């Protein structure tokens, strides 16, 4: 795709394209910078940028977008770890396509698990490639899926005051909203059993279910670690 827009009056025009011969000259950081300056001129609104790629000091400007994820369980399994490791680069505003973007086969269970993960992510955003067979709107699913999705979206709205507080803490102190477990428990760093478990703000511990249930038992088993202290099931 190509993007061309005049910024800061008519003095500068930046063209962003995926067809860049030299990756070191990819102008996305500059594009984000000048969009930020442009949005900052409107003091009555809080501007927001959605940036596809990441690099040095990416956290300064956009909400980072992980790119077009496939509609598969394997793709879903990678998202929590991706969100966590982004914190190592200071990136806390990270976003992915809830339900997946393209390819694969849509199914109710995969969609619900993706919604659950999205609810406990810094940015909750539904998005998909064009196509009449991609159902990202919750109301396009069966009644059971709609009910479960509604339950978690209402939970997300109840969490907004908490998320706002954690967002301000990130803004003031640079403490990521999503933190890998090994930030406080270094010994789990090399244990893949816990790599998708994370702290969501300072008070919540999230261990998302990202595996398909067994077709015979009609359930899934999920192993996770509970640190010392008193914890409550938030469900």
Q: Language-model segments: which ranges?
A:
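Active-site-proximal substrate-binding groove within the catalytic cores of carbohydrate-active enzymes
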Residues: 15-235
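Single conserved hydrophobic/aromatic residue that forms the stacking wall/gate
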Residues: 1-14
């Amino acid at each position: 795709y190509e993007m061309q827009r005049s910024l800061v009056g008519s003095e500068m025009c930046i063209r962003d394209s995926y067809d860049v011969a030299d990756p070191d000259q990819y102008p996305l950081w500059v594009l984000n910078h000048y969009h930020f300056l442009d949005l900052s001129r409107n003091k009555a609104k809080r501007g927001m940028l959605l940036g596809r790629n990441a690099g040095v000091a990416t956290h300064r400007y956009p909400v980072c977008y992980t790119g077009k994820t496939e509609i598969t369980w394997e793709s879903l399994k990678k998202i929590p770890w991706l969100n966590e490791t982004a914190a190592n680069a200071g990136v806390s505003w990270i976003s992915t396509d809830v339900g997946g973007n393209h390819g694969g086969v849509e199914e109710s269970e995969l969609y619900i698990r993706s919604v659950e993960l999205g609810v406990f992510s810094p940015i909750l955003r539904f998005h998909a490639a064009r196509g009449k067979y991609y159902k990202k709107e919750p109301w396009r699913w069966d009644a059971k899926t709609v009910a479960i999705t509604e339950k978690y979206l209402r939970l997300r709205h109840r969490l907004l005051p908490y998320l706002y507080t954690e967002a301000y803490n990130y803004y003031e102190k640079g403490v990521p909203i999503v933190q890998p477990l090994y930030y406080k428990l270094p010994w789990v760093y090399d244990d893949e059993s816990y790599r998708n478990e994370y702290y969501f703000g300072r008070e919540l511990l999230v261990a998302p279910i990202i595996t398909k249930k067994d077709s015979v038992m009609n359930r899934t088993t999920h192993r996770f670690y509970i640190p010392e202290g008193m914890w409550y099931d938030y469900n």
